[in-house]
Amino acid sequence: ATHQYIAPIEGTHLKLTIDETIQFITERELEKVFQERKAKRAAAIVMDPSTGEILAMASRPTFDPNQFNQFPASNRRNYAINDAYEPGSTMKIVTSAMALEERTVNANSRFYCPGSVKVGKESIQCANGKAHGSQSFAEIVENSCNVGFVQVGLDLGVERYYKYLTAFGFGEPTGIDLPGEAKGIIVKKETAATANIYLATMAMGQANAVTPIQ
């Protein structure tokens, strides 16, 4: 028999963006909130806004990798990338970016909030249940005013709103290169064009669903 010796080749390096101190704090604080709120699930992500690097990512419920078979299979699900939810008022920052870029508003644009607004047959109220009255654009952001953001969304219109949804990557995986990443759920543009209520609710963070990583 002949023998052939093949010299080993050094493997490639794998460098994580995770910061172990930030990861430890994130895990600790998420567990604390998860227990206090008696939540069914929770996720937290810490990102470097300059580079997009993920400094920490945690999900609850979780499991011990050394004894994974002693935990429900569902505990191995990474809710930070696997699950979609309505983002709520955090989406107002995205809507703000759209409107400022398109110059449909500026910091001093005026809005009036009587506490609710009628869109088609639906009535949309502000979360605090009270009227904010006359506000600048900066103030509707500060107050997270639903009525104000309904108007911002409607002023943008379907075409421009969807242009930016696509540009921001909503409705598609981010490409984080982790298994099982969901793409979220976006109302079809053709559907949104049929009634103002779709755009009105999207502008304040409802109707569409996103993943925490998005």
Question: Where are these predicted regions, by residue range?
Answer:
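Conserved, well-ordered alpha-helix/loop/beta-strand core segments that scaffold catalytic motifs
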Residues: T2-A42
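Beta-lactam-recognizing serine transpeptidase/beta-lactamase-like catalytic domain environment
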Residues: T2-Y5, I18, A44, P49-S89, ...
